């Protein structure tokens, strides 16, 4: 009936008539029907009570199925408690109540129900409860904070992992210390959250708290760096996005973190630094030029150069002299290799464009000297001749 988009009032009446039927799959259908009603209309108190009854009293789940081997050493639901939870009655009803809480007309009622659900011993159900809990902050920050602390009272790492977004919105300078145990548990997780590793996400939020001068945030960030390379990756990424900022203190701290790992040289860190050029804006080039120049002198650029070149291709028309300065370090750059990268001709194109744009004869001569030098290297010679021939043809 939901798929056929029947009349909302008819669907409501059917839900209220048959919701007590005790069948797991049927009850999941009831929850989906209430979800449809919630999206198309208002969920009234009767429907909220139905969800509450399911979330608090239904026997499903009976066990943590996500921890059980489904065969061949792979646990059910890939070992993910949230995916497991939303495929159970209590978990699905809980998730629907929390999502409804974003726009509910009955926030006090929702808080009361969620507070009872927080006592559920099921990790899967509590993951469903905490995943979207941040939506309740707008109704009452203090109640949401207390609810978060209750849900995570056992500091289970999976529950904390799915509560990281809510944690991010709840943390202030005054309550930061109360979240340190949660952050320390999350730091050791070697798994993904959505599209990124938990460690990378942690690196970003730990650096944010450090930039905001939260008490003990520097100590926690340093602990994170010792714990996980992924935390370093997240911090590098976050720092690169704050190298230009209205607050000079934030700029200085971001620069120090950005520069800190330039010579560490692991494959992941090398790749992360190249990816940082996706965060840079052309109009900010002069503000971060000194950092880019230092980067161009490091050994790490030998392995990953593609995004670096793409950024220079965007700025060369505006700052050809600075691009020529950077090209002087070409021996450090990743070499073109059709088997592994798409760098063919990029360095040569940037250099020729810089030469054509620059006015100062000193820089023109510098560009020619670099060009003569790269022609001595086979990996560049063929591409250089090809590009020059194309320019001659007009």
Stretches found by the model and what they are:
Residues 1-394:
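Non-catalytic all-alpha helical scaffold/repeat segments
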